[in-house]
């Protein structure tokens, strides 16, 4: 299938992945997990929501936990260059027959919300309330010391169409998994805006669903430390996969599940992709190193389970990729 070309002059300027809004069924339990075990910092909270961020982040929040009756991913947030980009985004959406709304969101500037053609619920904002970063507040460090939100990974029922849509928005392909043969289909794609391996990864599967969101950590030892913390604080069963190293992205990783089953990746050691002539790296779906350069094979849950988007029907994928699943 066609590999999208880099678009260097997109209709509006998305800078990076910014924040995720999660619907959770037990706000206290979710807060305790993300604050005390993982180590994110609570910036604000009330009876209906908790706002957290990593120690490197100047923005008010990078994850919002919202009290709800059903667990789901409510929104994926991206930061744009300035308020003018929001108006350009609105014009682009209108020209392409997509509805949008400007919504008031706590601690954020103007926020544009829309649902893309594939059911992913997105919001764009240029500004948030500012907070001092906490990098040098070692007395506040807990868990694995998360630094910053790095990326989102989603299950998409129509991978090629989703990849093509986000390529039009300036997301540049860094790596991809493809079937062998002259008519091989793309089954997964890693796309970036900020100059590392990805801000947004698109994976073949029942969708739209969130596979995971990820925080960047300073070292692999922080990931190993989190394993110790989770094992000694009642969360051993929440460690789903890893630690290990991906072939795709070269990242050292750990996947854990929160009390509602939302999947969080702790992530470090990928690489720079910001050069304009950076060539995407192709992986054959028959090459097991793409998922696991070393470490235990991924369990079935990692391939099959994800968080639905609030109010969106989940559809079967257009094709079923041949992947290796651990027994």
Residues covered by each model-derived region:
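Core segments of cupin and vicinal oxygen chelate
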Residues: 12-15, 21-59, 103, 113, ...
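Residue-level detector of secondary-structure transition/capping positions
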Residues: 38, 94-97, 170, 231
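Non-heme Fe(II)-dependent double-stranded beta-helix
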Residues: 57-59, 79-80, 143-144
């Amino acid at each position: 299938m066609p590999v999208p070309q880099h678009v260097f002059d997109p209709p509006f300027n998305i800078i990076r992945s910014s924040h995720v809004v999660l619907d959770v069924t037990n706000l206290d339990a979710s807060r305790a997990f993300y604050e005390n075990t993982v180590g994110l910092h609570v910036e604000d909270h009330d009876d209906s929501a908790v706002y957290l961020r990593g120690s490197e982040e100047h923005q008010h929040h990078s994850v919002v936990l919202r009290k709800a009756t059903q667990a789901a991913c409510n929104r994926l947030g991206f930061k744009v260059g300035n308020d003018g980009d929001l108006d350009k985004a609105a014009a682009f959406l209108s020209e392409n027959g997509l509805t949008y709304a400007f919504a008031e969101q706590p601690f954020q500037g103007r926020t544009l919300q829309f649902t893309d053609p594939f059911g992913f619920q997105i919001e764009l904002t240029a500004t948030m309330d500012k907070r001092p970063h906490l990098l040098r507040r070692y007395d506040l460090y807990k868990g694995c010391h998360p630094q910053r939100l790095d990326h989102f990974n989603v299950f998409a029922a129509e991978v090629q169409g989703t990849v093509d849509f986000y390529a039009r928005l300036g997301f540049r392909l860094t790596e991809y998994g493809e079937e062998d043969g002259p008519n091989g289909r793309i089954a997964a794609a890693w796309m970036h805006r900020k100059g590392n391996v990805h801000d947004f990864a698109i994976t073949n599967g029942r969708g739209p669903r969130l596979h995971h969101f990820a925080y960047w950590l300073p070292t692999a030892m922080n990931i190993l430390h989190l394993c110790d913390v989770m094992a000694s604080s009642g969360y051993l069963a929440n460690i789903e996969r890893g630690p290990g190293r991906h072939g795709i992205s070269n990242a050292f990783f750990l996947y854990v599940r929160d009390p509602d089953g939302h999947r969080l990746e702790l992530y470090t050691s990928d690489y720079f992709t910001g050069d304009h002539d950076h060539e995407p790296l192709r992986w054959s779906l028959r090459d097991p190193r793409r998922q696991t350069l070393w470490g235990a094979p991924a369990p079935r849950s990692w391939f099959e389970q994800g968080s639905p988007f609030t109010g969106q029907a989940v559809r079967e994928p257009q094709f079923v990729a041949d992947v290796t699943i651990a027994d």
